[in-house]
Every structure is written in C-alpha cells, then in structure tokens.
C-alpha cells in the first residue's frame, strides 16, 4: 500500500509540474502576443466568453509590471463631479452613429453637455465647468474619459482659462511631448502641455495629458497677441460625412476665437484659392503664398511632422493662427502623433499642404532642414535623451492607472513600439534623403537646330526623393575661352521644349585645369535654375505610392556666334543631390543623335510637297515623279512612299560629297545600251553616299545603269553599307555596272528575292556584292573583278549562283556564311587568295566550277563559335594552278567527286 501511495504521489507531482509548465508557457505566449492577434487569428476569439476571460487574465497580470522610478513627481489634481451630473453626462453621450455615412460614434455639439465640478490642485480649490471632449468615442465611451475644464475668468488656474485632460494613449503616451519638445527648437507656437495625474471623485490617480486649450490667455502668455483669428477644422456638421471637407467650402471652417474687428473669413477664402489643384503653377503663386503665410514656420512644421512620420494632418486636424498685425497665417502643430516610416514621396496630407509643397523651393528648404536635423548627432542624442526621460516619467503612472482601457502588457508593448518608431523614422529619413535618382539624355541636335546655334540639348528626368541639381558640365579645353567670352551659353527651357529668348540663361564659370581627358569643368552658378525637382508620384486608388515620379527638365547649350562642331564637342555632366550635396544616382545616361530621324517625315510627304521641295523632278501619271536630263545633287534627296520614282534613259546624276538618293517608293530605272543611266560623284576624290530603296513592297527594276564613286550612308535610322542598296525591297537588276564604291559594298541586298543578271562589279574598295537574308533567287551571268575584299559575300541566303566569273579580288572570290545554302554551278573562281570560303553552318553544293590560280581553292571553317560545322559538296569541277586545293578546319567537311 505504501508503495502505491509513493507511485501515485510521483504521478501527481509530474502532473502538477507539467500543469505549471504549461501555464508558464501559455503566459509567456500570451505576454508576447498582441490582443488583436489573439482575437482575430487564434481560436480564442471564436470561443464564446473566452475573449472576456482572456482580458480578465490579461489584466490580472498588471501586478507584474512596476515601471521605472520617475525622474520627477507629476502634478496631481482632484476633480469632483456630482454623481447626478456625471450620470447626466453619461446619458447624453452618443450610443449610435449620427448617420450611416459616419464611421465612428461621434460627439456632436448637442452631446457636449457642461456640468459643475470642483477642481483642486496644490491646496487650492476652483469651481469649474467640465464636459467630455474629443470627437471620437475612444475619449468618452469607456470609464476613463477625456475632459475639458473651464476655469472662471476671475480665478484662473496658473493663468489657464481652459484646459484639456486627454487620455494619454490618444496622444501616444510620451510621443506628443517629444513632438512639442522638437517644436520648441523651431520656435513653433503650440499649446502648453504637461503630464499629470487626476483623482476623479476620489479615485486612485489616473494618468492624463494636460493641454491648455486655445484661448487668448494662452496666446498672450506665449508672447503673441490674443486679438487674432485661430481657426480649427473638424466634423460632425453634416449628415453625409464624418469629417468636413474643409477645402471645398469656407463654411466648413470654424474659429476658437476671433479678432475684435470682425468675425469674417476672407483669409480662409484666399487660403482655399491657394489650395486649388494646380494653383502652384501660377507664376505668382510663391509671392502670394509668402504674403499670406509664414513659410519658414510652415517648413519647420513639416520637419517636426516628418520626424514623426506623421500622416495625421488631413482636413480634420488643422489649426491655423492668423495674425492681423502681420497679415499672415502661422501653422499650429496639433496632434502630430507618430507612425511607422513611409517614403517622403507621399504628399503632406491635405490640399493646402500638398499644393504648397509642390513649390520646389519650399520642398527643397524642408528637405534640407530635415537633413540638417538628422545629420546632427548632438540634436538626435538630445531627442533620444528627452524621449527616454519622458518614458521614465510616464511608465510607472501608466501601469498604476486602474481605469485605463489597456492592460499593462499592452501598454508596455505600445511604449516599446513607440521607442522603435522614434529611432526608425530618423534612420529612414537619413536613407530617404540620399535617394536622388536622375536619368540623363544628351541630344546631338538636328542640322536645323545646329543652324540655330544649339550644340547640345540636355534632358534630365528626376525621380528621386531628394531633388537633384545640374551642377557641372565638363567640355574640351578649346571651348573654354568661348564660355568665358559668353559665346557658349547654357539656358533652361521654359517648358515649351524648344530654345528661344523666353528661356532662362544660366551663368557659367570655368574651374581649374584640364583633366586627363582634356576636359575642363564648367560650374553652373544659379541653383534655382539648375534645380531638378520631382513632382507628384503616381498614386493608386487608395492614395498609396504606385510609381516614383518622372519629372522632366530640359537645358540648351548654345553658341551665340562661332559655330561649334557637335561631333567634336565631347562633354561630361555632373549632377548632385541638392539636399545632401553628394553625387546624385545617375540610373540612366544615354546619347540621342537627333540627326538620325530628322528627315523621317519626308518618307511619307505627298507628291505636291515633294515636287515643291525638289522642282527638278516632274510629275508623271497619277502618282509618279520623273527625272530627266543631267542634275547635280548637292544634298540627300528622300523620295516618299506616296509616289513612284521613274528615272528616264540617259539621266546623269552627279552627287556632291555624302549626298544620297533614298527612295521609299518603287523605282523604275530603265536605260538603253546607247543611253545608260549614270550616278557618279561630282568630284572623283569626294565620294557621294548611296542610291537606296527601303521597305517597298512593289518591285523595282534597274537596267542599263552605271553606279560609281559612292560609299555608305546612315539615313533615317538605317545604315546602308552598299553604294547601291535594296533593303526589304524586291528588285530586278540587269545589264548594270557597279564600280569604284568607297564603302563596305558596291551593292547590298537585304531581305529580298535576288534577281541579278549580267551585272559587272569591279574595283569596289571592299565587297562587290553583299547579299544578306535573301528569301531565294539567282545571281547569274555576272562578273566580279578586282574588288578590294570579296567578289561576292552571302549570308543567311538560299540562292542559286550560276555562270559567274569572280577574279582577282583582294580576299575571297566567293564567300558563303551564316547558314547559307547556295547552289553554285558553271562558275569560274580565279586569282583570289581564297577561291571559295564556306563558314558557320553553311552548306554549299557546287557543280562544274573551275578553281584557277587561287591561294586556297576551297576553305571551310567556323568563324563564329556559336555556329555549327559547314560543309562543301563539289562535283564535276576542276582545280588548276591553286597553291592549296582544300582547307577544312573546325570539323568542316569538304567532299569532291568527279573532279579533274
């Protein structure tokens, strides 16, 4: 029996230990879990009666919290209200929404019932009037309420006419005191505040935030005149909304008290005009704003607000002081609160502030003041010391307050979170103001703009939190003297996108000696004109930032006199963070050559416009333009897609240096053997450009034509490597000569069906004929003689080559590359370093081809490593006098059957 008792005792002990351990673990979890999580995300909130039990358990743990000893004793008051009066106040309080449009129980004017009370402090007793205060139910729906206390005029309390005793959690315990501490550093007007304890009808001390109410006495004690208008905003007036949309109508505004000369609202009327969307774009907006409001104090208010991450100054939380002796508003910081950090891209919070801080000078001043504040280690240490003092002052009294709604666990969690928010906002601001992103685009001007003196158009897109500034431009040393003489000038665009005298000139000053790139730094001298500000971000439907802003700014670098070659003018731009002074983040830096597409509109002009511009063409038929005779082409001519180009037999076109003829129209160019059509250079040693046809669906035709002395061209975004070029434009070319080209190719065909017959390619500086991406087609009965590089070069092309002769070319008689699959027969390849080269996954079939006196008759290899091995199949062909018959590299295969 005794053994059984021992065993049962051990089991009971184990059960007790497990139970105690479970309770301790549960208590630990409970202490670490916010009530909202317990209620909404765990089973506790779904068990009837469990939540109430949990709260009882939670509050039963209050005794575990003691709090640190306060550094000083809080002032204590006694407030006694007759039970009947207290009951009457309770019964007058709202229990239902004023209307279905409201989101909260709201204290409307008819519920603001005053009662007599006795107020005792420091052994002195006062007969006072009291009522509950605060718009929202958290101030008066529970046992502990916020109060307005009014003292008799003949017996003020420490000079106070009215005071507010506010539940401290509404002002986030110590936070509003820290905000006020910062306000004093900026000399901002604010109501005096204290932490106090109050015994209500003999209760234990309850913690309150005491704020002196807005009265003339309060202002005069702070050295301000009391004969002023002090404006407030709020709600509860309308059936349709809880908070008044005060920037919609003057009538929504109210006053705490008025100046003696009259109870009028003209200054608010003006304020609303300055708050209208887009008002800041008015050139006189800044002058109007600084006339009606103290912008220095407005900036200081913003700094204090942002230091707390505040987003609490919307329509219903505005307090404004209008001093008729100065004719100016002063912002009155009120209930700033504190929030988790959020990007400074957000607008400040109401229509007036949003519009005012859209003025770049005001926002820049605010950001610089913020940066100066958060970079001052002594300043921040002082803030943290005051925060810690306030924490110590409040903690023990908060825990001992028996009527507060929260448990001590919740209070401690909230206090610790507020400590974190204080520091995280500071660190976040430091990081945010370092973000100054800019994209730069340097535009080489079109020929038309060059003639107007423009050297560069400089476009900046600002999208950072902090504004940027265009601070320097480095230019070649030879142009520095022109800057000093005022010939080279920098202008800021007025917004119309083009340079003119209405733009604003910026002073420039050269600095120092040339750097290793022979560039001299030129400093800009006017910060206001070189500021690169960011406008509003893109917001989603909920008002959250969706996309950072893209705000464009344009500058013109011009020469007022001596022309400057834009190609020789190399420059380097420096952009700095206008807030921190450090280098801005250039996230994109590109150059745009506006000459490239400056003539694109000519590609689709109508026939009448074309003929007016080029009268040596003549109209022919319904949509044709024709050329006859001999003409000198001094500039590039672009034939639009709206016509057909006919070049008559016997026409000779002599092109000046670099001049071209580009057609977006089909070309009919049929000469006679006795009257060929010729295109050549005006001067033999000055190559002209190209004759090119681009993106034409209808076929062109060339017969009995001669092309010589041309080169290459880059027109409307297309590079033409051939003196004669057809890109994506079908053509038949017969009985034609292509010689003495100075570019990469005598003729270049791209994306076409190839149809070349009886064409002579000779003495071209590089390739005679270059075919790229041909659909199919034939090159036949043609000669390729003494070209500087390849006689013919094909890429990505499945064509037939027959009955041609390619001889004495500088590199290859015939080059086949990039997956081409030609069939070559009845052809002579003679006198070249390489007769036939097949490369890069190309596969050539040859029949009856003669290889004579070449260095290497047939070569096959991989040139580009991402291609496969090529192959060559040769039948019924002859090899004579070649130094080397075949050379196969990189796995290439060359097969020869029935060769002689």
Can you say where each PLM-predicted feature lies in the sequence?
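Regulatory N- and C-terminal appendages and interdomain linkers associated
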Residues: 2-123, 381, 392-587, 594, ...
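Conserved oxyanion/phosphate-binding beta-strand-loop segments in alpha/beta enzyme cores
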Residues: 113-169, 703
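Middle-to-C-terminal accessory/interaction subdomains
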Residues: 138, 262-269, 273-314, 320-321, ...
């Amino acid at each position: 029996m005794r053994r059984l008792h021992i065993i049962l005792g051990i089991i009971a002990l184990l059960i007790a230990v497990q139970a105690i351990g479970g309770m301790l673990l549960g208590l630990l979890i409970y202490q670490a879990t916010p009530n909202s999580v317990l209620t909404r995300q765990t089973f506790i909130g779904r068990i009837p009666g469990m939540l109430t039990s949990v709260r009882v358990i939670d509050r039963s743990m209050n005794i575990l919290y003691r709090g640190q000893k306060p550094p000083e004793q809080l002032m204590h008051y006694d407030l006694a209200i007759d039970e009947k009066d207290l009951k009457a106040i309770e019964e007058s309080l709202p229990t239902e929404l004023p209307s279905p449009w409201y989101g909260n129980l709201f204290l409307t004017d008819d519920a603001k019932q005053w009662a007599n009370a006795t107020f005792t402090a420091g052994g002195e007793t006062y007969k006072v009037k009291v009522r509950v205060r605060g718009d929202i139910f958290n101030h008066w729906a529970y046992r502990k309420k916020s109060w307005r206390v009014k003292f008799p005029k003949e017996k003020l309390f420490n000079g106070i006419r009215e005071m507010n005793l506010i539940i401290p959690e509404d002002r986030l315990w110590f936070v509003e005191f820290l905000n006020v501490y910062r306000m004093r550093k900026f000399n901002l007007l604010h109501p005096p505040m204290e932490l106090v304890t109050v015994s209500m009808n003999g209760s234990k001390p309850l913690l309150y935030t005491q704020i002196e109410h807005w009265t003339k006495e309060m202002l005069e004690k702070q050295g301000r005149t009391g004969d002023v208008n002090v404006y407030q905003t709020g709600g509860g007036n309308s059936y349709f909304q809880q908070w008044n949309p005060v920037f919609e109508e003057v009538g929504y505004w109210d006053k705490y008290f008025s100046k003696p000369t009259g109870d009028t609202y003209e200054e608010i009327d003006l304020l609303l005009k300055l708050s209208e969307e887009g008002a800041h774009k008015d050139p006189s907006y800044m002058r109007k704003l600084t006339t009606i409001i103290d912008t220095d104090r407005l900036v200081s208010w913003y700094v204090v607000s942002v230091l707390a991450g505040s987003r609490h100054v919307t329509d219903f939380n505005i307090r404004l002081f209008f001093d008729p002796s100065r004719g100016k508003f002063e912002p009155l910081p009120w209930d700033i609160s504190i929030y988790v950090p959020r990007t400074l891209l957000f607008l400040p919070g109401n229509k007036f502030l949003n519009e005012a801080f859209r003025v770049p000078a005001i926002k820049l001043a605010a950001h610089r003041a913020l940066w100066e504040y958060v970079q001052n280690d002594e300043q921040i240490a002082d803030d943290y010391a005051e925060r810690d003092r306030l924490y110590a002052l409040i903690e023990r009294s908060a825990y001992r307050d028996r009527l507060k709604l929260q448990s001590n666990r919740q209070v401690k969690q909230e206090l610790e979170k507020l400590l974190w928010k204080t520091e995280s906002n500071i660190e976040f601001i430091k990081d945010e103001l370092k973000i100054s992103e800019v994209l730069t685009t340097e535009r080489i001007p079109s020929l038309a703009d060059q003639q107007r003196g423009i050297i560069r158009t400089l476009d900046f897109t600002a999208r950072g939190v902090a504004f940027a500034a265009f601070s320097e431009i480095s230019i070649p040393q030879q142009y520095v003297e022109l800057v000093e003489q005022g010939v080279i000038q920098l202008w800021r665009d007025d917004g119309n996108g083009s340079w003119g005298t209405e733009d604003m000139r910026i002073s420039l000053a050269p600095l120092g000696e040339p750097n290793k790139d022979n560039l001299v730094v030129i400093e800009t001298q006017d910060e206001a004109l070189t500021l690169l500000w960011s406008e509003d971000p893109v917001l989603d439907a909920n008002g959250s930032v969706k996309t950072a802003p893209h705000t464009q700014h344009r500058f013109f670098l011009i020469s007022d006199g001596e022309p400057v070659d834009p190609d020789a003018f190399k420059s380097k731009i420096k952009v700095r963070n206008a807030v921190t002074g450090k280098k801005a983040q250039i996230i994109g830096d590109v150059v745009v050559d506006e000459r490239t597409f400056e003539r694109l509109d000519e590609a689709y002009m109508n026939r009448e416009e074309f003929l007016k511009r080029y009268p040596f063409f003549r109209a022919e038929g319904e949509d044709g333009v024709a050329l006859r005779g001999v003409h000198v082409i001094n500039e590039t001519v672009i034939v639009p897609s709206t016509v057909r180009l006919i070049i008559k037999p016997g026409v000779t076109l002599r092109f000046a240096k670099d001049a071209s003829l580009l057609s977006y129209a089909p070309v009919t160019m049929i000469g006679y053997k006795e009257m060929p059509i010729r295109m050549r250079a005006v001067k033999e040693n000055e190559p002209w450009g190209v004759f090119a046809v681009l993106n034409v669906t209808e076929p062109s035709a060339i017969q009995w034509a001669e092309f010589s002395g041309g080169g290459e061209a880059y027109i409307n975004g297309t590079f033409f490597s051939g003196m004669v070029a057809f890109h994506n434009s079908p053509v038949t070319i017969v009985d034609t000569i292509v010689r003495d080209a100075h570019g990469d190719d005598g003729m270049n065909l791209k994306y076409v069906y190839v149809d070349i017959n009886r064409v002579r390619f000779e003495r071209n500086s590089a390739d005679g004929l270059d075919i790229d991406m041909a659909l199919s087609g034939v090159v036949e009965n043609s000669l390729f003689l003494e070209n500087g590089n390849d006689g013919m070069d094909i890429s990505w092309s499945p064509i037939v080559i027959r009955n041609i002769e390619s001889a004495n070319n500088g590199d290859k008689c015939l080059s086949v590359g990039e997956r081409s699959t030609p069939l070559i027969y009845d052809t002579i390849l003679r006198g070249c370093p390489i007769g036939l080269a097949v490369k890069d996954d190309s596969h050539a079939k040859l029949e009856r081809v003669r290889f004579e006196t070449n260095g290497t008759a047939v070569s096959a290899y991989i040139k580009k490593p991402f291609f496969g091995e090529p192959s060559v199949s040769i039948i019924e062909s002859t090899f004579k006098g070649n130094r080397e018959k075949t050379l196969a590299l990189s796995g290439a295969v060359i097969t020869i059957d029935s060769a002689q």
